[in-house]
């Protein structure tokens, strides 16, 4: 579709939240590094997950698809040193997780991708390559990274405020090296929730890492991943769209969510409650957010950057002023998300000012409607769809198919809840 045309309406009903993309990436990787057969169930085959599957297959994992399950055997992982090409598509997780994994043994690998992926930072790895004499070459702006060599265990100093994905990539890799290792975090660590997901998944697959208060991680070498069966839980970063719609007056029951989850994006519940919405636990793994008298607040984007676009929609329709702070990393996602959500919501009638590392949002009673652009970013497209539920006139979203990156069934689910739309 080139565009979707949405007639404003409240959403109502129950929706099965897609499985967590973050946890699926991690489970596929750990299973692929295990010597034996694992079954990973409840998989949503988004573009990012397919990229990780294909990447691990390129490195030697045997992966079979059976409906929503993956049967994975890592017996032959990294057995040969033949030249390999790994297409990351637009998945930053695939790229940053698999780069160090590909260097567990001597290897030659070409990482390619598309979209904005070539513009996303990789300097953390380049510094490690130079220290360890791993050969590498890359093209500015485009993702065409060639690496040759292998990693050795030891001490790794990593900034914590660029992307937690670098740390996760090393956490997956270092237990399989001969030497013991230490990761030292040299700045304040952002997105701790994603590190928790990585550590939890690694532990489930039988690997031990000591976490010293997120300042350093101590990793014994010569460990091995153990195969297991694992079901992926529902994704709070996707539930955040429906929670936000609920806060704005829709009535949506979200299924397949674990309230004890380690997912950092679960923070959306606390933020929305702080703004005046109310959480309802309907039954086991079933949650709703109910509309309340919404007021502006301060939202720290450093620990939950992925849910900031849709929370900006809620803030735009809340009383008073909301400030998004510590959000500079949103500029290096699939698009510049601070600029994109500010620009597009203002087209719909919001009052948002863009800052270097955040936003100032002055609430309005309602949005008007109009034509907006997704910036080919899945989270911007879905956020604008939620904004349409509080518009007076129809909303036209250009380039809506980008939702396939993380949530291929979004538009069907939106319609099943009473959303009125047509694609062109």
From Swiss-Prot:
One Gene Ontology cellular component annotation held by this UniProt entry: cytoplasm
Main subcellular location of this protein, as a coarse class: cytoplasm
Binding site for 3-phosphoshikimate: 21-22, 26, 163-165, 191, 306, 333
Enzyme class: transferase
Enzyme Commission code(s) on record: 2.5.1.19
An annotated Gene Ontology molecular function: 3-phosphoshikimate 1-carboxyvinyltransferase activity
Cell compartments where the protein resides: Cytoplasm
InterPro entries the UniProt entry points to: Enolpyruvate_Tfrase_dom, Enolpyruvate_Tfrase_sf, EPSP_synthase, EPSP_synthase_CS, RNA3'P_cycl/enolpyr_Trfase_a/b
Catalytic site: 306
Pathway assigned in UniProt: Metabolic intermediate biosynthesis; chorismate biosynthesis; chorismate from D-erythrose 4-phosphate and phosphoenolpyruvate: step 6/7
Disulfide bonds: none
Catalytic activity annotation: 3-phosphoshikimate + phosphoenolpyruvate = 5-O-(1-carboxyvinyl)-3-phosphoshikimate + phosphate
Gene Ontology BP terms: amino acid biosynthetic process; aromatic amino acid family biosynthetic process; chorismate biosynthetic process
Family classification: Belongs to the EPSP synthase family.
Subunit structure as annotated in this protein's UniProt entry: Monomer.
Record-given protein name: 3-phosphoshikimate 1-carboxyvinyltransferase
